[in-house]
Amino acid sequence: MHKAIIPLLYVLIFSVSNLFAGNGSKPHYNDKDINHIVSQLTLEQKARLLVGCPGSDKGVSHIVAGSAGYTFPIDSLDIPSINLADGPVGVRITPVLPNKPYTSYCTCFPSTTTLAATWNKDIARLEGNAIGDEALAYGVDIVLTPGINIMRNPLCGRNFEYFSEDPYLSGIMGAAMINGIQDKGIGASLKHFIANNQQTGKLYNDARISQRAIREIYLKGFEICIKNSDPWTVMGSYNKIGGQYTQANPELLRTILRNEWNYNGLIVTDWYKKRDTADQLNGGTDLMMPGEPAQAREIVEAV
């Protein structure tokens, strides 16, 4: 559990640093304090940090209407909640700005496929900059984009979110967008790791893929993204590969993502479809979203 909390606290440091940057103040803690903070957490608090909470929770101080979810705050240690908002072609929220009588929507950019068709990573980075600016203006900490799944099924209802059929193009353009978002002090979320390539049956599909195809096609774009950017988070996928859910797969999450690619950020579940919480945590997932109180209890019971 200690290893799972560390990436989350690093993300908190980045988001809190960003929050205070505008007024000259400094965050309450920095990376040197991580182990000290963890040592002060109770078992129940550690479990709650690994499970999201609804925006209606009384501890969440900054609500952004339409956000995808929040992490659980620990007020006694000045640990705030993290606000996560969906993408992929802009910040997906429905907020109202102070002293404005109307709802202030964010920009809807052209489809990610259209962006990829430019073959221009500078434009991808500029779009990321714009998304980061809008997230910053509304108080969003992490934007759940980009999606770089491979277009293998032309009937996939989310192909518009993805870049292309080619892992190299997808990886290079995805990395540029991530860098653009994070230039602004906002976190990006690289998704859906991996082989989430159709909507039909996506919650339970069991993808049977050869090791060569996994490495050369389905993992390659993610590898390129990780090595050319440093996304704050990576989001898992709903499906199975070879009979095992990807969000509880230590070969994918620990051996490849963590050890081979040296990824040190936060690994997040996809939203709503609850799995075996202990299996996911043991498999390498750090944060269960959007979170249910039962999941925190399951973590405590599994320790």
Please name every model-derived segment.
Residues 1-26:
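Bacterial Sec-dependent N-terminal signal peptides
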Residues 18-303:
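Glycoside hydrolase catalytic-domain context in secreted enzymes
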